Curated annotation (Swiss-Prot):
Spans through the membrane: none
Chief location: cytoplasm
UniProt keyword annotations, A-Z: Cytoplasm, Decarboxylase, Lyase, Porphyrin biosynthesis
CC terms in the record's Gene Ontology section: cytosol
Pathway(s) annotated for this protein in UniProt: Porphyrin-containing compound metabolism; protoporphyrin-IX biosynthesis; coproporphyrinogen-III from 5-aminolevulinate: step 4/4
GO biological process: protoporphyrinogen IX biosynthetic process
Organism: Myxococcus xanthus (strain DK1622)
Source organism superkingdom: Bacteria
Protein name, UniProt field: Uroporphyrinogen decarboxylase
SUPFAM superfamilies in alphabetical order: UROD/MetE-like (SSF51726)
Function: Catalyzes the decarboxylation of four acetate groups of uroporphyrinogen-III to yield coproporphyrinogen-III.
Record-listed substrate binding positions: R23, Q24, A25, G26, R27, D72, Y148, S203, H316
Keyword Cytoplasm carried by entry: yes
Length: 348
């Protein structure tokens, strides 16, 4: 197996810098669109053969160092007993969670019974790849999932979830606790199915002040990370707009902290220290730069991150209009310049 990513997550030496891309299996790939044109998104997530097929597509086309299982962070939420509608315009909960009664109605599902198709997709992905690269399992963080559930979908202001947290903190903690009780076995199921590393996405964590994040989110993330690390796999935590939260993310005990593009890698390293690996952090829209400029951005990030304990990635998901050839150019540039970085020959 190409184990660069796993070695980097553990801050062990690698021959070059490993790279994968958030949302690397997605609408920017014509082969993905060919499959997606015949099946609804949620149905695709629940079809192990097709989910495995689209998981493998970017590994084949781009040469990335890992496959992240094709799924959605809201899959385990649906298994808790709430109606979920997923389409190209984003998620929608027609019956949002707003009261104690709503929270009490939510179950803590058996992961195999409620989401076993995710485990099966991981097994089929490993077989299709012949274990050539590791498979990344993932889940959303309790706050991000709760934000969707309470708001009823995406939000720009997060008024409803924040009001719940600030006006009825005991209810918010009850919801976060129930989500954590669901997510830990869900991720352990993915590890048992063959995921070699897992990522926890707190996509909307940057909506909270560091003070509120420490109070409402860190206790649950610490518990998740601790229980997952006990399985022996490395754990990545990532959120958008969280440059001022890095020390908090480090406190979770995660092996890797993902950075978005708003903070240079070397500055993130200073906050995190030498005992945590980093992931990131190219702006997804830099894939629209001319190739020479994109190449320069790759070099700069590699130089700032250093040769060990760095997984190259975007600062958030790859965007649908992205040219797949630009993504392939990026992967090849990371690998090429990663070697030069280790040889001391990385130019300007």
């Amino acid at each position: 197996m190409n184990d660069r990513l796993l070695r980097a997550a553990r801050r062990q030496p690698t021959d070059t810098t490993p790279v994968w891309l958030m949302r690397q299996a997605g609408r920017y790939l014509p082969e993905y669109r060919a499959i997606r044109g015949n099946i609804a998104f949620l149905d695709l997530c629940k079809h192990p053969d097709l989910a495995a097929e689209v998981t493998v597509q970017p590994v084949t086309r781009l040469g990335v160092d890992a496959a992240i299982i094709f799924s959605d962070i809201l899959i385990p939420v649906e298994a808790m007993g709430i109606t979920l509608e997923l389409g190209d315009k984003g998620p929608h909960f027609p019956d949002p969670v707003r009261s104690a009664a709503d929270i009490d109605k939510l179950g803590v599902p058996d992961p195999v019974e409620g989401t076993g198709f995710v485990a099966e997709a991981i097994r089929r992905t490993r077989k299709a790849l012949n274990d050539s690269v590791p498979v990344i399992g993932f889940a959303g963080a309790p706050f991000t999932l709760a934000a969707y559930m309470v708001e009823g979908g995406g939000s720009k202001s997060y008024i409803l979830i924040k009001r719940l947290m600030f006006e009825q903190p005991e209810l918010a903690h009850r919801l976060f606790g129930k989500l954590t009780d669901t997510l830990i076995p869900y991720l352990k199921m993915q590890v048992e199915a063959g995921a070699s590393i897992v990522q926890i996405f707190d996509s909307w964590g940057g909506a909270l002040s560091p003070w509120d994040y420490e109070r409402f989110c860190i206790p649950y993330l610490k518990r998740m990370v601790s229980e997952l690390k006990a399985t022996g796999v490395p754990v990545i935590v990532f959120g958008v707009g969280m440059s001022s939260h890095l020390s908090l993310l480090k406190s979770t005990g995660a092996d890797v902290v993902g950075l978005d593009w708003t903070l240079p890698m070397d500055e993130g390293r200073k906050v995190l220290g030498p005992d945590v690996a980093v992931q990131g952090n190219l702006d997804p829209l830099h894939l629209f730069l001319p190739r020479e400029e994109l190449d320069g951005r790759v070099k700069d990030i590699l130089r700032r991150a250093g040769p060990e304990g760095h997984i190259f990635n975007l600062g958030h998901g790859i965007l649908p209009p992205t040219d797949p050839d630009a993504a392939k150019f990026l992967v090849e540039a990371v690998h090429r310049h990663g070697v030069a970085l280790r040889q001391g020959t990385l130019g300007a």
